[in-house]
From Swiss-Prot:
Keywords assigned: Chloroplast, Magnesium, Membrane, Metal-binding, Plastid, Thiamine pyrophosphate, Thylakoid, Transferase
Subunit and interaction comment: Homodimer.
Similarity section: Belongs to the transketolase family.
NCBIfam families hit by this protein: tktlase_bact
Organism (species): Zea mays (Maize)
Protein name: Transketolase, chloroplastic
Length: 675
């Protein structure tokens, strides 16, 4: 196999040392030139990085997106010069010498923490500690799922590994334990994590706050563990550990690699000062002397260059072999091949939108969480990459795909993922699934208020263009008796403030279907669907097309785009807006009702369209939403009124809270009379 070929050409002796030192000095020089960055980790992890990229991993540097590549995640994202140096040596066009010299500068392809959308070859965006290892669990889940679903006894078409380097900081974060607990439970045998055990944290030696036995904890989580005691020069030990890890196919492996942070620096090695700042000219010189490195800055010695140059033809050959294998597979298993292809490319089957349910005002009213389940189940039949689940609330979030079983260790082809009560890990795992292949459409669910437990991962979804669908139910005081700990208030506006994420709050069946259409189409932008626990009617005038515009008129008894009053609402309050409009019309007023499903989508429409919905000449405007009023001023204007909730909720039947908090038809009518 390819791995053996690569290992057969491994660098040894002097060339190996030279190659590893090249990695170290590219990192040192880039950090020094930027006068900013983290040299310590790349200096300490260069040996394991070298073994992975030069001897073990399968990839094609000229096509960073080849489907069956091994994935590498640098969870300790601050050490990104390690990865940039490796991508540069391996021949990726995304990291040329000039890019290394532009490390951490405006517009460069080598940002201060790895960003998948900036640098082809970087799989996921890391930096907030713990996110990367959790993303890697998602990548490994995706591989295990596709392998179980598409491999045949005579054709292993999906077969790649996920490698991670994580540090002490990642290990301390709760998200890492959540995700690694699931990885052990799922038996993700193709996930191999290297724990850079260097005993240094930013505030000093890890003795000050981190003294647990990490390996024993991982064994308890169901991982295989190995300890490489000399990560600085123990190349054969690193190689043997990887071989052993691959032989254990039913468990993920943690390889604890004890390293010296800043290895080679005579005065700063093994100190926290080498973690996050440049060595300084004097210490760089001392390190050059110490490691016997007589070369100029950013220099790659000829023999090192020529040794690494083989990855370009070998990578092309690996991909060509796989393509030939896939062509054979296609002949034998045409249907499966077509499905797998759509997950690989992200091309949705024609007519998938027609699968979404349609509703009329006569359809029986229902909670939008239940309508969401109808949409999810309809989509699961036509969107092959739809996969997901809930943080132990599937029966409350209504996210079960009824035609599939549970994704488990021995039933990895199934599409219901049981995340357990692990919101943060769930979000980051879904990011990994989304970024594995363009045709994956992962969704995850909990109560909307508990997005507070997963915001770190949701922000990374938005930043890294991971099209995760967040199915967030129990979206307001409308959930009733569970009270203020469970009732979202500030959540809608907080996500509207977050860049590159769609906040959708549908009011009924057609709007829920529209929200799903938007969410599935936005593969580079995550979506949050805020859904009700309480039953709502299907309103006249709502539509899928309207949702796509973010805000649209559902009823209007005026002419010439000049109503006396505009009432806008979202979700469960749209019904209240519509009822109030009916009352006001009986009194002779002309009233327009606007459904405002998504601020972001509305803001993206043309000025003409916005004027057709919210004409500037009409200043009598009212908004109603069971959440914070912050931000509504933008749409109701200086003369308008925003009805909402700017305090915590309460424990009582939902109807009572609505009344006590003034989220009512009467409040709208009173506000209308004040104009």
């Amino acid at each position: 196999g390819a791995v053996e070929t690569l290992q057969g050409k491994a660098a040894t002796g002097e060339l190996l040392e030279k190659s590893v030192n090249t990695i170290r000095f590219l990192a040192i020089d880039a950090v020094e030139k930027a006068n900013s960055g983290h040299p310590g980790l790349p200096m300490g992890c260069a040996p394991m990085g070298h073994v992975l990229y030069d001897e073990v991993m399968r990839y094609n540097p000229k096509n960073p997106y080849w489907f069956n590549r091994d994935r590498f995640v640098l969870s300790a994202g601050h050490g990104c010069m390690l990865q940039y140096a490796l991508l540069h040596l391996a021949g990726y066009d995304s990291v040329k010498e000039e890019d290394l010299k532009q490390f951490r500068q405006w517009g460069s392809r080598t940002p201060g923490h790895p960003e998948n959308f900036e640098t082809p070859g970087v799989e996921v965006t890391t930096g907030p500690l713990g996110q990367g290892i959790a993303n890697a669990v998602g990548l490994a889940l995706a591989e295990k799922h596709l392998a179980a679903r598409f491999n045949k006894p005579d054709s292993e078409i999906v077969d790649h590994y996920t490698y991670v380097i994580l540090g002490d900081g990642c290990q301390m974060e709760g998200i890492a334990n959540e995700a690694c607990s699931l990885a052990g439970h799922w038996g993700l045998g193709k996930l191999i994590a290297f724990y850079d055990d260097n005993h240094i944290s930013i505030d000093g030696d890890t003795e000050i706050a981190f003294t647990e036995d990490v390996s024993t904890r991982f064994e308890a989580l169901g991982w295989h563990t190995i300890w490489v005691k000399n990560g600085n020069t123990g190349y054969d030990d690193i190689r043997a550990a990887i071989k052993e890890a691959k032989a254990v196919t039913d468990k993920p492996t943690l390889i604890k690699v004890t390293t010296t942070i800043g290895f080679g620096s005579p005065n700063k090695a093994n100190s926290y000062s080498v973690h996050g700042s440049a060595l300084g000219a004097k210490e760089v010189e001392a390190t050059r002397q110490n490691l016997g490195w007589p070369y100029d800055t950013f220099f790659v010695p000829e023999d090192v260059k020529s040794h690494w140059s083989r990855h370009t033809p070998e990578g092309a050959a690996l991909e060509a072999d796989w393509n030939a294998k896939f062509a054979e597979y296609e002949k034998k298993y045409a249907d499966d091949a077509a499905t797998l292809k759509s997950i690989i490319t992200g091309e949705l089957p024609t007519g998938w939108v027609d699968a979404l349910p349609k509703y009329t005002p006569e359809s029986p009213g229902d909670a939008t969480r239940n309508l969401s389940q109808q949409c999810l189940n309809a989509l699961a039949n036509v969107v092959p990459g739809l996969i997901g689940g809930s943080a132990d609330l599937a029966s409350s979030n209504m996210t079960l795909l009824k035609m599939f079983g549970d994704f488990q260790k021995d039933t990895a082809e199934e599409r219901n993922v049981r995340f357990g009560v692990r919101e943060h890990g769930m979000g980051a795992i879904c990011n990994g699934i989304a970024l594995h292949s363009p045709g994956f459409v992962p969704y995850c669910a909990t109560f909307f208020v508990f997005t507070d437990y997963m915001r770190g991962a949701m922000r990374i979804s938005a930043l890294s263009e991971a099209g995760v669908i967040y199915v967030m139910t129990h979206d307001s005081i409308g959930l009733g008796e569970d009270g203020p700990t469970h009732q979202p208030i500030e959540h809608l506006v907080s996500f509207r403030a977050m860049p590159n994420i769609l906040m959708l709050r549908p009011a009924d069946g057609n709007e829920t279907a529209g929200a799903y259409k938007v969410a599935v189409l936005n593969r580079k932008r995550p979506s949050i669907l805020a859904l009700s626990r309480q039953k709502l009617p299907h309103l006249p005038g709502t539509s899928i097309e309207g949702v796509e515009k973010g805000g649209y008129t559902i009823s209007d008894n005026s002419t010439g785009n000049k109503p006396d009053l505009i009432v806008m609402g979202t979700g469960s309050e749209l019904e209240i807006a519509a009822k109030a409009a009916d009352e006001l019309r009986k009194e002779g007023k002309t009233v327009r009702v606007v459904s405002f499903v998504s601020w972001e989508l509305f803001d993206e429409q043309s000025d003409e369209y916005k004027e057709s919905v919210l004409p500037a000449a009409v200043t009598a405007r009212i908004s109603i939403e069971a959440g914070s009023t912050l931000g509504w001023q933008k749409y109701v204007g200086a003369q308008g009124k925003a009805i909402g909730i700017d305090k915590f909720g309460a424990s009582a039947p939902a109807g009572t809270i609505y009344k006590e908090y003034g989220i009512t038809v009467e409040s709208i009518i009173a506000a209308a009379k004040s104009f």
